[in-house]
Amino acid sequence: MTKKRDLGIKIFADGADLEEMKRVYEEGLVDGFTTNPYFLMLAGVSDYEKFASDVLAAIPDLPISFEVISDDFESIEKEARIVSSWGDNVYVKIPVTNSKGESSADLIRKLSGEGMKLNITAIYTPAQVRTVVGVLSPETPSVISVFAGRIGETGVDPMPIVRQAAEMIRHQPLPHTELLWASTREVYNIFQARECGCHIITMAQDILNKLDSIGTSLERVSMDTVKYFYDCAVRSGFKII
């Protein structure tokens, strides 16, 4: 992506490549950032707090979500307080359950009630959304992240689930809570997310790189595809006749 586009929805960058995060921030291409342990591992991050410190020094004024890494709620709470202290623009990512399937609702209620900005992650079902909506403070900024892309990979249409989530947030009401479309798989998800009522869509760098293709004529894409396949055939030296 070479310039920021007004797509009617906030665009967040999802990843943990510090140089890429700095680049898209400096070029004004996104509205915020999300990270997770997978991206940290992929980027070879060995010191989480040092990484976060470097990110926040470079990006002081856009929302950034950092995830807790423990699995028991006592440790999650301790980590959440530490992560929250890293900066005013930090949202603490807390999974909707731990790895045993135990609900994080009580902890979410406690921390949100204290004014801690949270990003509730790994949400897949309307029941999970309903639980989270019921415990978030209406006074505290928060994000509800529905993993629409991964829902789609199970053969389930994510759009009705995301629409229900948007309705629940509106009717609670939670004026400072934003709905985020997570695990983005393709550029078209932007328009699906907007249609469903999402405030934010987060996407990895490979999807961000494709945003300049929005609006390209399909005839042009068709011709480019033919040229690409022809070039592949020529370079491979294939012969039929």
Residue ranges and their predicted role:
Residues 2-110, 114, 148-151:
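Active-site beta->alpha loop and helix N-cap motifs at the rims of alpha/beta catalytic domains
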Residues 41, 50, 128, 210-211:
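Flexible domain-boundary/linker segments
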Residues 102, 109, 116-209, 215-236:
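Catalytic alpha/beta core domains of metabolic enzymes, predominantly
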Residues 240-241:
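C-terminal extensions of enzymes
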